[in-house]
């Protein structure tokens, strides 16, 4: 067993040869490398599969022996300081390694077909390989220095992948926004790391935890300074995991290719912040203020992410805000001290969300056959609907991920979310009520996405998108499907410049050639499709895109079973508890692992009821128009025109504007921080040009005129010398006698 652990250092470096070889090949043998480009995807999958097998082997050994292995190389600089590098193999490392590799393999297989017609195919797989290396290096790090190095590499890779289509202005702005926002958190992380080193004198986790706990126990450290350092470290996790208030980069990150969105949202970048807090939980756990602060940020993010997802029309942005809310659940669990439930939800959510994002990519891929390459149209749920009969496999797998995220048993997310909700009642009643209500909102908005995408008729034809009849306006409100209607030109539903809505109001025709579909985008030109037919309706993608959906669907069905505590009658099947032994769980330190089935069913009824309520309301409002007229009659009979109806409409519009405008947080940041920095830059520019340059230029001009005067005086004429001499003497005497 120990021989297996000794080779743990190789885990991050196995995927690394692919980006190196691609770079060298493009530099030295560009033609041959491009001709063999499909070979690189196979090698990427093969190497990541090797890492997955190795990680599974380590996990099995840990489950059986509850062992932790750490290896350190010391580089002694002097007697007072030594720089150490190594790797740490513990339950958290093995969980994250399996998560990264399994989701990564599915994304790579999916991307082989999804990116097949992209000219930057090789660059994509080079970035993906480096991304996997960076994340695997992060989770195997044994000290804070290595954590920070790989933390920055993960941020750099996310910057490259979000801005993959960098010649598109939106993608370029999105990657810059993600980079700058994460730099704020990373600066706090660096300061926090240096602060903890100043306190303990060590970067190694084991020494750091032991020394710090002893200092806290003996009351030999300033509590305010310790809290500040812990808060700065937590700021790094807040930015990376898109927690309030540094969440603003996440929806814009959808400008990258859809497989990148799946990888970032499931197992890599956003999971890094959760991993950091979980790794440093022995530090945070002895600082009550920080634990309370973590849970507070978590519950705010839970509610904010859910409300912002309510009115999104872009399918990927809706899923992005869903990720933000679910990460808030994980952060809430860590703040409550429920270490096990946080990691459990990290696992279940990763597979469910990867399934949903890859499913959305399949939907987008199929919609492009009708509307052409345009993210405003192919990702717009207003133009979708009725896709069930066109892409049934995608529909069924997407429904599986939808129900899992809603919290419907026995799917994966039900078990983990239910555990977090149960623990929240033991921690804070207010937090528990918010978390429970948000579970209903989650079911509402995620099922809304499903209904708008797959149920009813294909709206791109229904609203005469390529037809002849003029449509005045097509709205998709918060509480129902779109309907054509005339509107007042002075009416403004939201304060944002709604580019998305205007993009599909114009009556245009988007023909598709019979043999060739030319789709041109900046830097990327797609000139050939294998399907040489005219498509007026979407179609199911190739098998290489469907296979990952089916595998992730199986994970969504069965991965929740690893955390179910079936351990009665001497049979212990709670794999996750064995895996995490000894785990940290403040709420259940004195409880046995056996399940109280009465409590389980009581809590299950509560959580499942709110989920079904959200699904029912979404079905009531977003069912196909032809089958929901009676529902609208029922709603109209309940909410008749009058003062109450007017008040209700104002509330609905307020909620819609709040959601669609992202709670006005982006606008606030733009006006306050961005505007303030630009104002300061203008002031600095004015001071530099007018004051600093003015003084410098003024001295030069004065010297010029003085030189000209001296040159005129020194012309060699004695009469001029006498004249100026007598003039200066007269002025001097006059001033002298007056004073």
UniProtKB/Swiss-Prot annotation:
Q: Which ranges does the record mark as transmembrane?
A: 9-29, 40-60, 89-109, 125-145, 147-167, 184-204, 224-244, 258-278, 289-311, 318-338, 354-374, 396-416, 427-447, 546-566, 605-625, 718-738
Source organism per entry reads Coffea arabica
Q: Quick check: keyword Protease in the entry?
A: no
Q: Which family does it belong to?
A: Belongs to the complex I subunit 5 family.
State how it assembles.
NDH is composed of at least 16 different subunits, 5 of which are encoded in the nucleus.
What is the name of this protein?
NAD(P)H-quinone oxidoreductase subunit 5, chloroplastic
Provide any one GO MF term from the record: NADH dehydrogenase (ubiquinone) activity
Membrane topology of the entry: Multi-pass membrane protein
Supply the Gene3D superfamilies for this chain. Answer: 1.20.5.2700
Localization (cell) = Plastid, Chloroplast thylakoid membrane
Biological process, per Gene Ontology: ATP synthesis coupled electron transport; electron transport coupled proton transport
């Amino acid at each position: 067993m120990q021989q297996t652990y000794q080779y743990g250092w190789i885990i991050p470096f196995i995927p690394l040869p692919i980006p190196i070889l691609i770079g060298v090949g493009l530099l030295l043998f560009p033609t041959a490398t491009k001709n063999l480009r499909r070979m690189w995807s196979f090698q990427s999958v093969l190497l990541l599969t090797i890492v997955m097998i190795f990680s599974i082997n380590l996990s099995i050994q840990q489950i059986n022996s509850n062992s932790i292995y750490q290896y350190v190389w010391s580089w002694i600089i002097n007697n007072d300081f030594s720089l150490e590098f190594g790797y740490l193999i513990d339950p958290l490392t093995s969980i994250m390694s399996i998560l990264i590799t399994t989701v990564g393999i599915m994304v790579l297989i999916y991307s082989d077909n999804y990116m097949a017609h992209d000219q930057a195919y090789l660059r994509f797989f080079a970035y993906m390989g480096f991304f996997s290396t960076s994340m695997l290096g992060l989770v195997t790090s044994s000290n804070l220095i290595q954590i920070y190095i790989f933390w920055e590499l993960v941020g750099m890779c996310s910057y490259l992948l979000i801005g993959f289509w960098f010649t598109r202005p939106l993608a370029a702005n999105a990657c810059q926004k993600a980079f700058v926002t994460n730099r704020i958190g990373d600066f706090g992380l660096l300061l926090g790391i240096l602060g903890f080193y100043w306190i303990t004198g060590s970067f190694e986790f084991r020494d750091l935890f032991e020394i710090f706990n002893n200092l806290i126990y003996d009351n030999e450290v300033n509590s305010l300074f310790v809290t500040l350092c812990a808060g700065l470290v937590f700021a790094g996790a807040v930015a990376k995991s898109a927690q309030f208030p540094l969440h603003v980069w996440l929806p814009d990150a959808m400008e990258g290719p859809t497989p990148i969105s799946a990888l970032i949202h499931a197992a890599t970048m956003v999971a890094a912040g959760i991993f950091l807090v979980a790794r440093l939980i022995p530090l945070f756990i002895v600082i009550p203020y920080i634990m309370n602060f973590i849970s507070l940020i978590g519950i705010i993010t839970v509610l904010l992410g859910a409300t912002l997802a309510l009115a999104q029309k872009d399918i990927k942005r809706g899923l992005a805000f869903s990720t933000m809310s679910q990460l808030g659940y994980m952060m809430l669990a860590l703040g409550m001290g429920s270490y096990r439930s946080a990691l459990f939800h990290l696992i279940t959510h990763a597979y469910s969300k990867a399934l949903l994002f890859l499913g959305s990519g399949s939907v987008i891929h199929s919609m492009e056959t009708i509307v052409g390459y345009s993210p405003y149209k192919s990702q717009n749920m207003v133009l979708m609907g009725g896709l069930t009969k066109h892409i049934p496999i995608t529909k069924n797998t997407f429904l599986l991920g939808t129900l899992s995220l809603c919290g419907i048993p026995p799917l994966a997310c039900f078990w983990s979310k239910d555990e977090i909700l149960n623990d929240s009642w033991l921690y804070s009643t207010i937090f528990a009520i918010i978390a429970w209500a948000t579970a209903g909102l989650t079911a509402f908005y995620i099922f809304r996405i499903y209904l708008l995408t797959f149920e009813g008729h294909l709206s791109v034809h229904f609203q005469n998108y390529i037809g002849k009849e003029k449509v005045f306006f097509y709205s998709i409100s918060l509480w129902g499907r779109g309907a054509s209607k005339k509107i007042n030109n002075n009416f403004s539903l939201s304060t944002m410049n709604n580019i998305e809505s205007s993009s599909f109001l114009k009556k245009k025709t988007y023909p598709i050639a019979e043999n060739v579909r030319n789709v041109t985008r900046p830097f990327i030109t797609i000139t050939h499709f294998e399907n040489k037919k005219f498509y007026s309706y979407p179609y199911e993608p190739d098998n290489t895109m469907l296979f990952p959906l089916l595998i992730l669907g199986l994970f969504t069905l069965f991965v929740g079973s690893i955390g179910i505590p079936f351990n009665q009658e001497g049979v212990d099947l709670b794999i996750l508890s064995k895996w995490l032994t000894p785990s940290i769980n403040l709420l259940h330190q004195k409880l046995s692992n056996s399940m109280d089935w009465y409590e389980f069913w009581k809590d299950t009824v509560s959580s499942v009821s709110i989920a079904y309520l959200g699904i029912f309301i979404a079905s009531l409002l977003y069912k196909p128009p032809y089958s929901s007229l009676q529902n609208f009659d029922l709603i109209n009979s309940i909410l008749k025109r009058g003062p109450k109806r007017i008040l209700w409409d104002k509330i609905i519009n307020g909620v819609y504007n709040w959601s669609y405008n992202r709670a006005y947080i982006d606008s606030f940041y733009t006006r306050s921080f961005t505007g303030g920095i630009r104002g300061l830059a203008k002031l600095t520019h004015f001071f530099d040009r007018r004051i600093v340059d003015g003084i410098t230029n003024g001295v030069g001009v004065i010297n010029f005129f003085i030189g000209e005067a001296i040159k005129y005086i020194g012309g060699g004429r004695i009469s001029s010398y006498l004249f100026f001499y007598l003039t200066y003497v007269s002025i001097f005497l006059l001033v002298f006698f007056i004073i």
